Amino acid sequence: MQQYFVKGSAVSPVTIEDKETSKHMFQVMRLKEDDEVTLVFDDGIKRLARVIDVEARQFELVEELVDNVELPIQVTIASGFPKGDKLEFITQKVTELGASQIWGFPGDWSVAKWDGKKLGKKVEKLEKIALGAAEQSKRNLVPSIKLFEKKADFLAQLDKFDSIVVAYEESAKEGEAAALLQAVAGLEKGAKLLFIFGPEGGLSPAEIESFEAKGAVLAGLGPRILRAETAPLYALSALSVLVELEK
């Protein structure tokens, strides 16, 4: 069954105001009266909805659906600006894997340099990608996107998290294997966890020092060196095993 995220309150009848969503529903998918879809409103609750008026783009809400697929903890993925379209790939995949927020920051060793204007366009593009991935993976929410123009603004946000894990390849080389487990252990439902990943060139010693000063722990992600766009996927997959599949 098709799923769509819609703005506003869950009150029948629901009129689809967003032009792109409406186009996909009634021109691409060719929905007709009495067809049913899943609508997700701002409250994150899924509801079964039935088309009652194609021309008016209206649905009636049939029932709430007990289907919460979100991770039990809120995970933010923060990546140093990578080259090309790697952040688009990261956004799509970590959305599918359950991230609540997706952040980007200018790393000391980032090759990509984006000013305010470019960042605005990038955010718009990433938001569309996150929306599509959230619909495809039947999420209850769409991850929020934030790209920081200044690293100082990013660092100022770190105090808001219950736990911070920095993916650091030097830790992997040293055979470290327990930091990720320790960082996740004991986190209660709804806790806020931040994963920080470097760009292609990795994280500088100065950045590591700044993150550790904020209480971050350094964690290796297995014995192999992962690409900038692969590491977030590994981390979220491992986290899912720890907080979902083992319970």
Feature map (PLM): residue ranges:
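Structured adenosyl-cofactor binding patch, chiefly the S-adenosyl-L-methionine
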Residues: 204-247
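Active-site/ligand-binding-proximal alpha/beta "capping" segment
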Residues: 164-202, 206-208, 216-219
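N-terminal-biased segments
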Residues: 26-54, 152-183
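RNA substrate-binding interface of SAM-dependent RNA methyltransferases
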Residues: 68-166
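N-terminal positively charged helical leader segments and presequences
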Residues: 1-67
